[in-house]
Amino acid sequence: MRKNKVKQMMAEGKPVVNGWLQIPSTVSAEVMAHQGWDSLTVDMQHGLVDYTNALPMLQTISSTDVTPLARVNWNEPGQIMKILDAGCYGIICPMVSNKEEAERFVQACMYPPRGYRSFGPVRGLIYGGADYADHANDEILKLAMVETKESLDKLDEIMSTDGVDGIYIGPADLSLAIGEKPGFDRPEDTKAYSEILRILEHAKKNNIFAGIHNGTPEYAQKMIDKGFNFVTIGADQRAMSAGAKAIVEKMKGSISKKESETY
C-alpha cells in the first residue's frame, strides 16, 4: 500500500503544513495541490463541499505528491467509510467529546477485528494499491477534534482510545465552548490559549500527534515551536480573497497617486 507521507513525517518529528479546501472545485484544488503543501484537507463540514464534489477533488490532489485528507461533517460511520473508499488517506472528525465517540470514529476507519469498516475501497485500491486491506488500518490518519466543553474534561480518555493517531484543535469552536468569542490565533491572555496548551500537553503525554487550525503562517510557526506536529493555515477561499485584495489595493493606490500628481 502507498505509504501515508503525513504519518511518516510526524513520526520522524517533521511538522506537516496542511492546506484547507472549502471551495467545491477541482480547479482550485489543483491550484492548491501545486503550491507545496504536505497535505490538503477537503472540508466537508464548514466548506461548500459534498461527496460529489469531494471525489473529483481527491482525484485531482492524488495526481500530485500531496496527501489527500478530509474533514467529515459529523461522526457518522457511513460518511467516514464512503470518503475513505474514495481514496482519502486521513479523516479529521469534528466534535469528539468522549471515549465512546472516539471509538465510534476510529472503528469506522478500521477493518475488523480492530473496527467495523465495511470493505469496498473502490478508489482506495486504485490510489492505495492492491494490498490496501492489509495496511489501511495503520496507514489511514485518524485525527479527533477536541473542541467541546465535555471533551476538555475527558482529554485522556479520548487520546488513549486505541486507533486515535492524534487530535486536531478548532480554535473557534473551542473558544465558544468556554464562553469566549470565536476565532483563530488566540491571544496569550485568553482562556482558549491556555486550553490549547493544556490539550497539547495531554497529547504529548499520550504520545499522539497534535494539530491545530491557524489564521496566519506566523501563528502556525508559533504552534510548531510549542510542539504541534500538524498545522493548517487558513483556507483556499481566504488565500484567494487575501491575494485579490492585496492586488486591488496596490493597484487602486497606484492609480490614486498618479491622479493626485496630475492636479
Predicted regions and their residues:
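Expand to "…catalyze enediolate/carbanion chemistry for C-C bond making/breaking, isomerization
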Residues: 1-263
